[in-house]
Regions:
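An alpha-beta-alpha
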Residues: 39-41, 57, 145-192
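Pocket-lining segment of extracytoplasmic ligand-binding domains
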Residues: 179-248, 254
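Short, Lys/Arg-enriched N-terminal segments with co-localized hydrophobic residues
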Residues: 1-6
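Extracytoplasmic "Venus flytrap"
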Residues: 38-58, 64, 73-83, 181, ...
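Structural motif
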Residues: 71-93, 203-219
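Sec-dependent signal peptide cleavage junction
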Residues: 22-34
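Beta-alpha junction/loop-to-helix N-cap segments that form part of ligand/metal-binding clefts
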Residues: 76-135, 229-253
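Hydrophobic alpha-helical segments within soluble ligand-binding/sensing domains
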Residues: 127-168, 268-275
Length: 275
């Protein structure tokens, strides 16, 4: 598979000092004057990719500011977007200096929760889709900035074609509740159809119907494609237990999902994404 297994790509590099300078609470990233900062971290759910992004962020902030200059209030929403809103509201009430919103629902909750506290998003595939920005040009503006985990979707399609040139039917398996997953499968579908594949959507609403939808997709497909998707990332064992015995290969949108149920991916490094 050569260089097709993992491709690291850091996107939208940001300095902490610049991010903290946005909005009304301007901050200089220097611990020399004795300032102490509180950073609220809202992570949608615990899985390998999001954990790595959070850890990369914490490591870099600690390196830049010093261990004694920053306190992290780290909260996990357990996959519930409503809990994201509750967490963000607590950060706003506590007047934290910065919010790290890890994953799209966390970013959406943060954007709705405050226009004053600086927000950094991470593990967000497409900010325009996430925030409903029709004319998104790569800059959100206001108090929001961040890093994107959008993989090279055209190259993922090309990789699938290189690995499985004789396949005809590709099943696109994704969570319909995740807007960025829809964006990815739409893009990959268009690329695969250019290459002559027949593609079919297999959307599940949550983890409860993943098994039945994955089974249907496996029965009808030569290859399965799953995008960068938080529900998939938390339930790779379900997919693996269905696709592996059926000998239907799975191409994935990121490294953590690939390690759980896939055969190949082109992926960013989520640790680097958080840095």
């Amino acid at each position: 598979l050569g260089g097709y297994i993992i491709m690291k790509r850091k996107a939208l590099a940001i300095t902490l000092a610049a991010a903290m300078a946005m909005g009304t609470c301007a901050v200089t990233a220097s611990a020399a004057d004795g300032d102490k900062y509180t950073i609220g971290i809202c992570q949608l759910v615990q899985h390998e990719a999001l954990d790595a992004a959070t850890q990369g962020f914490k490591d870099e902030v600690t390196k830049e500011l010093g261990e004694d200059a920053v306190t992290f209030d780290e909260q996990n929403a357990q996959g519930d977007s409503n809990t994201c809103s509750t967490i963000i509201n607590s950060f706003v009430s506590n007047n934290v200096d910065l919010i790290l919103a890890n994953a799209t629902p966390a970013l959406q909750a943060a954007a709705a929760g405050t226009s004053d506290i600086p927000i950094l998003g991470t593990s967000v595939t497409e900010y325009g889709v996430a925030l409903g920005l029709d004319d998104f040009d790569g800059t959100v503006g206001g108090n929001i900035s961040g890093t994107a985990d959008l993989a090279p979707l055209d190259q993922q399609a090309a990789m699938l074609n290189e690995l499985f040139p004789d396949a005809k039917n590709v099943g696109l398996l994704y969570c319909s509740a995740e807007a960025n997953s829809q964006y990815q499968v739409d893009t990959v579908k268009a690329e695969l159809e250019k290459l002559g594949y027949t593609c079919e959507y297999y959307a599940f609403s949550d983890s409860n119907d993943l098994s039945s939808v994955a089974t249907t997709a496996t029965d009808a497909s030569d290859v399965i494609y799953v995008p960068t998707d938080n529900t998939v990332a938390s339930n790779t064992e379900i997919i693996n237990n269905i696709c592996l015995p059926a000998k239907v290969p799975v191409i994935t949108g990121e490294e953590g999902i690939c390690s759980g149920c896939g055969v190949a991916t082109l992926s960013i490094s989520y640790y680097d994404l958080g840095v």
